[in-house]
């Protein structure tokens, strides 16, 4: 995907060295946007192999409202292990905010159900937004949300989605985020009777950890391969009923995996 490789090249060319929470160090740019036409193929990075199983299970986990890593571990997904406590809990992270956002008055809102209902009721609304950024609960979270707000947009029978991500680990995290929100857009379009439009990915602090520089340079030498297709089970009518086997990526071909250490 040229859009992703262009981001990597921009960070290498223009990035500013910054200290970070993990002590690893980054090179960073501020404010970058990528746009993917979802009708042209499913946007999975092909210049290294992605573990789509982890992406699908993580999204299903978010949508369930769960915030304990047990489900992920039972399905061979370890991407949240470093942040979980001894009981596997992460505090009120994404799933909690998506499905039971708690306001100052103690009222909870199922934002996913609300936004799907609102797309059906009022597709021209400019308020089709889900936020995972709850300032009152940030200190209870194992990790404050990086991909923190997304907005849907309906035009000409097509559903588009824009994500705002405050912080993007461009080598390890951003390819996952692109695929995850593209999948979410397909799923929401499916249950609202719409076609897919664009996925727009806006990143605030887009960075490369300094111990990922050589891996990214290797990726930039590789020619992107054709994008795969996404197939969803047509019998599923509720977004909360999707299971792993209802989601299939067809024709994914990639260059070999490139290892990179996670900065915790």
From Swiss-Prot:
Keywords: Cytoplasm, Methyltransferase, Nucleotide biosynthesis, Transferase
Catalytic activity: dUMP + (6R)-5,10-methylene-5,6,7,8-tetrahydrofolate = 7,8-dihydrofolate + dTMP
One GO cellular component, as annotated: cytosol
Chain sites annotated for binding (6R)-5,10-methylene-5,6,7,8-tetrahydrofolate: 51, 169, 263
The protein's Enzyme Commission number: 2.1.1.45
Quaternary structure and interacting proteins, as annotated: Homodimer.
Family: Belongs to the thymidylate synthase family. Bacterial-type ThyA subfamily.
Function: Catalyzes the reductive methylation of 2'-deoxyuridine-5'-monophosphate (dUMP) to 2'-deoxythymidine-5'-monophosphate (dTMP) while utilizing 5,10-methylenetetrahydrofolate (mTHF) as the methyl donor and reductant in the reaction, yielding dihydrofolate (DHF) as a by-product. This enzymatic reaction provides an intracellular de novo source of dTMP, an essential precursor for DNA biosynthesis.
HAMAP family, sorted: Thymidy_synth_bact (MF_00008)
Protein name: Thymidylate synthase
Native source organism of the sequence: Brevibacillus brevis (strain 47 / JCM 6285 / NBRC 100599)
Lineage per the UniProt record: Bacteria, Bacillati, Bacillota, Bacilli, Bacillales
